[in-house]
Amino acid sequence: MMWQLARQVLGSAGKACLAFWLFFMGSGFGFVYFLSSAEAFAGIFTGFYTTPTNYTAENIVWVNPIVDLLIPQRATLFGWCVLFPALYLVWRFCMEEETRLWRYLALLVLPLPLMHTHSALALVLICLACGVYTLVCRPRTKAVLAPWGWFALVCGVVWLVEMWNTVFAQSLDGQHMLRLHLNWINGQDDGTLKDNYFWFYIKNIGLVYLLLIPAFFHAKPKQRWLYGGGLAILVLAEFVVFQPNNYDNNKLLYIWHLLGCLLVASLLMDWFSKVRAIPWRALGLCLCCFIAMFGSVLTVGREALSDYWQWSADDIAMADYIDDNAETDAVFLTSDSHLCPVFSLAGRRILCGSGSFVYYHGMNYTAECNAMHQLYENPDEVFLAQWGIDYVLFDSYVFSNIQNADESWYAARYPLWYENGGSRIYKING
């Protein structure tokens, strides 16, 4: 649907193809940091989180949307599956004056806040820009304005009900779900920036960012109005954070970037269409695509070529044993590693998961985290019973993250239920 959106907005299949690739395979200049040596370049394919689109040591954080958003984050995948066709309908509803489409648009987006709140907010801001366009550029008649009113009323009422006890409650509960913060992940808590504001986006987004201004003035008036919704997203996301993790504002910024890719694709295709010699035209486009996409090509290539293992054979064997022999409702005391085989492979409940899961979406499990440390460092039978622990795991993750873990206390009191390599599990109950 992203391609269909681009084709509808730009009026050209060729421009739509370029916009599609600029968005899904576009990247900045992060690849330059890996050209210093063969070893550094090889690290793209062998290192952990060392790619031209995700290299935090140099403040490169504009990740590839396929590898780092759509595949690992189901909410983003589901949200974009609704948002992109919704934007397609918004364009036809507003800019092509097909007012009858408001019903289908409303029906499509009614569940969006429950699927992906950031996509819902992005849609609101783009609709606001399109609504302003309608007021300014079209007759203010009932036939023109009534569909907007019905669309806003239906979505407003349903979305309010959906978000009342979730999004709104979390935003106002004092857990820092909604607060002011400057310049996304480049901004620091003291108000300073890690990099110069413009240099941060130049090296992260690259060619598309450099061409945004000429692309905006080259665009047609309706395309500029649509991009105005993207600018509203950018301004809001640069000053307001909507969740405890500042980084997650990128789910808004990528929609601004999507609209920018449309304009830049149109600009590049129109520029090179003026080059009469086809070989030079092709060479120019290929050079632009290389500059704009090389980082993402390396990032995606890394996924196919990297050969490190997430779990060892011992981890898999332990997970199989747990799956076959542990009660389905058993609770395990483990480290909070997001790769813990008990949870990620065997699917059993654990006391405390990684903070990278839902903690940054407003679920506060500080008590569970503190209990995890106490049960490893200062274990107590009463405290074990209080948290309903059935099994306790000791492995390399436990000893590396909890330095004072007291395995001897468990070994003296409970039977060794499982042992494999460096992993041992003690059974607490029964």
What positions do the PLM features span?
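Hydrophobic/aromatic-rich transmembrane helices and adjacent perimembrane loops
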Residues: 1, 76, 121-123, 245-273
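Transmembrane-helix signature of polytopic, membrane-embedded enzymes
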Residues: 6-60, 95-97, 278, 282-285
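Hydrophobic alpha-helical membrane-interfacial segments at the cytosolic entry of transmembrane helices
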Residues: 19-22, 139-165, 208, 212-214, ...
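Membrane-interface alpha helices of multi-pass inner-membrane proteins
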Residues: 67-70, 89, 102-117
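Hydrophobic, aromatic-rich transmembrane alpha-helices
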Residues: 85-93, 126-138, 203-224, 270
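Perimembrane helix-loop-helix junctions
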Residues: 90-97, 105, 122-153
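Transmembrane alpha-helix segments characteristic
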Residues: 100-111, 126, 148-153, 219-241, ...
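Extracytoplasmic
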Residues: 276-430
